[in-house]
């Protein structure tokens, strides 16, 4: 059995079949599968999917991604689909299912409970002078929608002044691909945005945005989640998003925080009771 992960190796089954490889080969896509309209904009979209069909099993994060893929198979390739997920197209047979990745929930609960005695978490709680701590934890990546997130928080302070001094946004965003120019630009823009918001609304004893371009240990992050009132998870696109799951698992059962979740994260399919928002709509966020 060969198990292949993510789009970087999407063509590998086709190459292995050329080498007479007869083992079962499975493929799991961690990112969202594009809509038919976007996929067909690629000149070689048929060749791409043809290579994908050389896998015996194709896995996606959500049922929605499976349905989008099957729509392409039927409408563009004239393929057929069986009730068990088997597909027939381009003279090949494969099978498609969704396998949402997750977390070790019991482990996260245990870790978060232990943070009640964490010195670092106590320091955070002591330093927060507001009623509502909002926490965001993301890689510094364009897909996470951090610029729009800061814009939404600025919109909140501008149009709902009662939240000035009553909220604090703690955004943790460790560097991702720091040597790439585009990622350096994201960091520069975020630092500029945070500076403008803090300059406009901050005071000597209150900083609206605490933006930290560094990582923290998992135990510390779970403690930050546990002591916040809002978890802000607003990616522009995300296959699943495990931060959303960690946020929920880390909460106190007696007094949980609220998860604000992008409709474009795969996790939204599993958490309909979260506050589902469009990250492009600052008023909605």
Segments predicted by a language model, with ranges:
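Catalytic cores of carbohydrate-active enzymes across secretory and cytosolic contexts
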Residues: 1-285
């Amino acid at each position: 059995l060969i198990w292949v992960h993510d789009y970087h190796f999407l063509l590998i089954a086709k190459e292995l079949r050329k080498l007479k490889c007869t083992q079962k080969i499975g493929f799991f896509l961690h990112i969202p599968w594009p809509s038919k309209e976007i996929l067909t904009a690629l000149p070689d979209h048929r060749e791409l999917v043809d290579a994908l069909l050389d896998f015996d099993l194709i896995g996606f994060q959500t049922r929605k991604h499976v349905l989008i893929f099957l729509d392409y198979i039927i409408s563009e390739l004239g393929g057929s689909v069986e009730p068990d997920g088997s597909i027939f197209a381009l003279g090949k047979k494969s099978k498609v299912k969704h396998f949402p990745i997750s977390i070790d929930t019991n482990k996260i609960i245990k870790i978060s409970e232990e943070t009640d005695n964490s010195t670092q978490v106590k320091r955070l709680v002591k330093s927060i002078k507001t009623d509502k701590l909002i926490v965001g934890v993301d890689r510094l990546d364009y897909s996470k929608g951090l610029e729009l997130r800061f814009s939404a928080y600025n919109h909140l302070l501008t149009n709902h002044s009662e939240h000035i001094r009553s909220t604090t946004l703690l955004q943790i965003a460790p560097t991702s691909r720091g040597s790439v120019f585009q990622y350096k630009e994201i960091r520069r823009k975020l630092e500029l945005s945070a500076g403008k918001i803090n300059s406009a609304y901050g005071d000597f004893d209150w900083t609206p945005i605490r933006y930290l371009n560094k990582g923290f240990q998992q135990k510390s992050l779970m403690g930050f989640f546990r002591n916040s009132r809002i978890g802000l998870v607003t990616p522009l696109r995300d296959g699943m998003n495990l931060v959303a799951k960690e946020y929920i698992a880390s909460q106190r059962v007696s007094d949980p925080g609220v998860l604000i979740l992008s409709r474009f994260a795969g996790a939204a399919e599993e958490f309909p009771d979260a506050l589902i928002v469009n990250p492009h709509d600052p008023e909605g966020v």
